């Protein structure tokens, strides 16, 4: 299922296994920050101002809250709800409209349907009307039920009517029930090959643990690992996001493939052929940590990445993938004719290679770097002073 439009389009679902190690997970969990029509304008504006503050890069991947959930609380001003949706749409995030009122849903979609939001509001009592509204606007419909049986019957009825553009809301009765539903839905779809439950799921932890930020963080982690395609939370500040996005990135990498970057010469800080050369392995985490520190130093340098099978420095050295022979060969074949500088900085953890490299690379000065990447900034500034 695809939601959103343009740069904010995301794929959900498509999973074929219950556990990551069986093959791999396909579509990563997306996080939504919730707004509600029961909140006053100041609180809504404050929350909308906070959302863009969490936006950073980790190992080459952008980390930010991709979605905004706008909930309609019963007996609140309907026109104001549409205004809140309009405000949220201006944030350039994909929206989820939590609304069971058919006419209000229609009005809210009018102000944001181009961005392909999710309309989360179908249940056993209104699914036909809600489906018509969602289909007309060309958006994904969120379906819920008081229990799994009702949810199953509602989804079956929607499929029969021709709407297969759905997301399943696991419910907010209790944490235990929501977790059980998420697991049962995935098991039915993957293990029992039941297509009726073969849709992405939405978990609203903002409703499950309202007002309890610590519990919401715990639930965010749990539903990232256990089958939430979209997880809705009340707040997501920088301190809460760091461990959460790190967890998600680990869960949704492919265990069949090492995380590696392409071998080559990476010019940093406007480096040219006369700039200092440093070398390390092609393990993605090593590359991004080292390149980040090098950029922070502001010293122009060429970072040379050779093929070490996607292993970290010590692992590659122990496995024979990082040796004086492999480094010297790579420098001679791919680097020597492209740079004029003859100073090469090697990782501190393989200082033992210094002597061999000096013998195999005549004319090169081999320099040993510090043991930790965090020490590189001072090291480089002292070296080039």
Language model features with spans:
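Conserved mixed alpha/beta catalytic, RNA-binding, or beta-rich assembly cores of soluble enzyme
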Residues: 4-5, 10-19, 29-337, 341, ...
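Extended, highly charged clamp/arch subdomains and adjacent linkers
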Residues: 22
């Amino acid at each position: 299922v695809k939601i959103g439009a343009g740069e904010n389009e995301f794929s959900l679902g498509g999973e074929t296994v219950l556990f990551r190690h069986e093959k791999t997970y396909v579509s990563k969990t997306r996080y939504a920050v919730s707004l509600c029509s029961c909140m006053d304008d100041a609180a809504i504006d404050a929350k909308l101002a906070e959302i863009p503050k969490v936006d950073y890069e980790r190992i080459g991947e952008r980390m930010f809250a991709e979605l905004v959930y706008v909930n309609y609380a019963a007996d609140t001003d309907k026109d104001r709800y549409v205004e809140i949706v309009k405000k949220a749409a201006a944030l350039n995030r994909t929206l989820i409209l939590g609304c069971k009122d058919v006419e209000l849903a229609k009005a809210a979609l009018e102000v944001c349907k181009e961005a392909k939001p999710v309309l989360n509001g179908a249940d056993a009592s209104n699914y036909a009307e809600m489906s018509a509204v969602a289909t007309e606007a060309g958006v994904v419909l969120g379906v819920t039920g008081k229990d799994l049986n009702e949810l199953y019957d509602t989804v079956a009825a929607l499929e029969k009517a021709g709407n297969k553009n759905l997301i399943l809301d696991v419910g907010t009765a209790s944490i235990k029930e929501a977790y059980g539903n998420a697991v049962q839905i995935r098991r039915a779809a993957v293990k029992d090959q039941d297509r009726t439950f073969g849709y992405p799921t939405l978990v609203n932890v903002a409703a499950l643990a309202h007002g309890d930020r610590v519990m919401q963080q715990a639930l965010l982690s749990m539903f990232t690992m256990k089958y939430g395609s979209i997880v809705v939370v009340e707040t997501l500040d920088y301190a809460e996001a760091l461990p959460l996005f790190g967890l998600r990135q680990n869960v949704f990498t492919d265990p069949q493939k090492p995380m590696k970057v392409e071998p080559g010469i990476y010019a940093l800080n406007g480096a040219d052929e006369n700039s200092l050369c440093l070398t390390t392995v092609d393990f993605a985490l090593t590359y991004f940590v080292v390149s980040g520190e090098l950029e922070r130093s502001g010293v122009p340098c060429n970072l040379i990445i050779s093929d070490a099978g996607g292993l970290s420095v010590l692992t590659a050295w122990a496995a024979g993938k990082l040796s004086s022979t492999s480094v010297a060969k790579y420098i001679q074949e791919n680097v020597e004719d492209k740079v004029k500088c003859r100073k090469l900085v090697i990782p501190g953890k393989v200082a033992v290679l210094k002597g061999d490299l000096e013998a195999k690379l005549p004319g090169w000065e081999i320099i040993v770097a510090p043991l930790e990447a965090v020490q590189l900034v001072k090291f480089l500034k002292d070296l080039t002073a």
